[in-house]
Amino acid sequence: MALGLQRARSTTELRKEKSRDAARSRRSQETEVLYQLAHTLPFARGVSAHLDKASIMRLTISYLRMHRLCAAGEWNQVGAGGEPLDACYLKALEGFVMVLTAEGDMAYLSENVSKHLGLSQLELIGHSIFDFIHPCDQEELQDALTPQQTLSRRKVEAPTERCFSLRMKSTLTSRGRTLNLKAATWKVLNCSGHMRAYKPPAQTSPAGSPDSEPPLQCLVLICEAIPHPGSLEPPLGRGAFLSRHSLDMKFTYCDDRIAEVAGYSPDDLIGCSAYEYIHALDSDAVSKSIHTLLSKGQAVTGQYRFLARSGGYLWTQTQATVVSGGRGPQSESIVCVHFLISQVEETGVVLSLEQTEQHSRRPIQRGAPSQKDTPNPGDSLDTPGPRILAFLHPPSLSEAALAADPRRFCSPDLRRLLGPILDGASVAATPSTPLATRHPQSPLSADLPDELPVGTENVHRLFTSGKDTEAVETDLDIAQDADALDLEMLAPYISMDDDFQLNASEQLPRAYHRPLGAVPRPRARSFHGLSPPALEPSLLPRWGSDPRLSCSSPSRGDPSASSPMAGARKRTLAQSSEDEDEGVELLGVRPPKRSPSPEHENFLLFPLSLSFLLTGGPAPGSLQDPSTPLLNLNEPLGLGPSLLSPYSDEDTTQPGGPFQPRAGSAQAD
């Protein structure tokens, strides 16, 4: 028995020993084959000697993919003189080249990837890119790898261009050190390239029939890292300038170079939005870049048109970075580096109100007008653009003098519009006070149309009181009759005297009839007896700009009057004259004292809104050629004529290419 057990054990041990020897031999053979395969790869011998088996297999698969890709028709057509330039390509590029398969595997990366990410070429080739990008960017990359399908039935090629931003892992620090992959940070890369489909060369099967393979889908990208503004050297050159914005893209700082390249002074841009100086056709693309900036921290815009001060535009590209100066979102700001691609083009084309001096939305300079800019008596005002309906109130003239000849203080468009009204009122108006010795700053000659323009009846209805004051009071009293109202169902009364949204067109009285025996309710006047303060000539208020000057605002009643609404009006009637004076002081301009003469009411204007002041189109009674183009650009006129070029008499020029400025129009103001 013992001898049998010993023989069985010896046989088992011999088998195990033979199995271990066979496994050791197979592993040695595999290692030898893998190292031979590693030396076959196009790497330096010192690099391939330190590769493990998994890396050798990964790099071999990637090499076979690139070999098939390079054997395709388009890749195989390489000029004889192209090889010496391969080393210069990487030096000229500010990024690295990356080739992705349809599954997202990195088939190839250029050698200079380590300068931008800190990871070597061998560490990335063959891996899936989804393991190295931010989780929030994986869906965007998957959409870029998917071929876009066209919905048209015609055979139209799908767009192959791709441009997006990715956040990849980077082991580089700001001081140039390399960290571990577990401590890597995110770095924003601007990726641009094309989706390619290459047909491999046809191969013949053993049966003799050609074996066709599906085309190879790959995404060829150039990835450029966006530099941080703090790493830029101070001299940016004449073709670039720096600016800082708030999170809503309003200028908080701008470099002085903006005056040389675009004609703006830094003070003109402070507080203005950057969107106001971008061409309307490029605003959508810039808005997408700003959205990427706020979500990823850095972004690079495409080539867009930045509007110049005196007309025209400059082709520009911007690198933007969100910089945090402390804790909280309020301490964040956006620093932009603008690179100019061209000089000023199309200098005669005005594309925005910011490019005109008279329609500029920047704050007015508070100071005395210079002797050169002060108009002289007899000068005319030429406004070829949007109509300007303005009525100035010189402080040196009395109310009676203004009422006697109001057309002297109207713009030409306003005189044409109010011509029939002013003619009819000037016959009845008699000045009670002689004219002051001081003449107005801009007297204008009257130019009235012979016929009644269209819409004058509506203007007469808005600008004049068609009924007497007593008739208006009668209608309001009837509307508030106690027999027709249920006081328990009424909301508390709130005074609307200070509501700036009310105007004369919304306060027209309704057609009620006053019953017999009704007692009229006493009314307070719309104008209170306050003398106007002395104002500077540059700060003349516009008539109708103060809602308290509206002749149609509801007036307060007398607390002693017997009114059915006395219980609901206690809070309004309890206001003192001191509160009213405080409201006037908050406005900054005290309304002038109104003359008790009823014949002056024909010259009071209702509150003009901004849309009414900037109404586009020709003035009533004027002729305009409908074939005269506003702009010589192939773009929709959705912005309206009031926001486009107001110069219809100048010869427009055809816009040049974005990178070929014409001679004569390439000088910046």
UniProtKB/Swiss-Prot annotation:
Listed result of changing residue 492 to A: Reduced hydroxylation activity. Reduced ubiquitination
Compositionally biased tracts (Low complexity): 530-541, 550-564, 629-646
Effect in UniProt of substituting residue 467 to R: No loss of ubiquitination. Reduced ubiquitination
UniProt xrefs under InterPro entries: bHLH_dom (IPR011598), HIF_alpha-like (IPR021537), HLH_DNA-bd_sf (IPR036638), PAC (IPR001610), PAS (IPR000014), PAS-like_dom_sf (IPR035965), PAS_fold (IPR013767)
Name of the protein: Hypoxia-inducible factor 3-alpha
Native organism taxonomy: Eukaryota, Metazoa, Chordata, Craniata, Vertebrata
CDD domains linked to this entry: bHLH-PAS_HIF3a_PASD7, PAS
Annotated stretches, region: NTAD: 454-506
Gene Ontology biological process: angiogenesis; apoptotic process; regulation of transcription by RNA polymerase II; response to hypoxia; transcription by RNA polymerase II
Domain PAS span(s) in chain numbering: 82-154, 227-297
Gene: HIF3A
Compositionally biased spans, kind Polar residues: 430-444
Region feature (Nuclear export signal): 230-274
Pfam families (UniProt xref): bHLH_HIF1A, HIF-1, PAS, PAS_11
Induction: Up-regulated by hypoxia (at protein level). Induced by hypoxia. Isoform 2, isoform 3, isoform 4 and isoform 5 are up-regulated by hypoxia in a HIF1A- and EPAS1/HIF2A-dependent manner. Isoform 4 is down-regulated by hypoxia and up-regulated upon restoring normoxia in embryonic kidney cells.
A GO CC annotation given for this chain: plasma membrane
Region annotated Nuclear localization signal, chain positions: 77-100
Subunit structure: Isoform 2 interacts (via ODD domain) with VHL (via beta domain). Isoform 4 interacts with HIF1A; the interaction inhibits the binding of HIF1A to hypoxia-responsive element (HRE) and HIF1A/ARNT-dependent transcriptional activation. Isoform 4 interacts with ARNT; the interaction occurs in a HIF1A- and DNA-binding-independent manner and does not induce HIF1A/ARNT-dependent transcriptional activation. Isoform 4 interacts with EPAS1. Interacts with BAD, BCL2L2 and MCL1.
Post-translational modification: In normoxia, hydroxylated on Pro-492 in the oxygen-dependent degradation domain (ODD) by prolyl hydroxylase(s) (PHD). The hydroxylated proline promotes interaction with VHL, initiating rapid ubiquitination and subsequent proteasomal degradation. Ubiquitinated; ubiquitination occurs in a VHL- and oxygen-dependent pathway and subsequently targeted for proteasomal degradation.
Documented effect of changing residue 570 to R: No loss of ubiquitination. Reduced ubiquitination
Motif LAPYISMD location, chain numbering: 490-497
Motif annotated as LRRLL, chain positions: 414-418
Modified residues (4-hydroxyproline): 492
Residues annotated as signal peptide: none
Ranges for region ODD: 452-581
Biased composition (Basic and acidic residues): 10-27
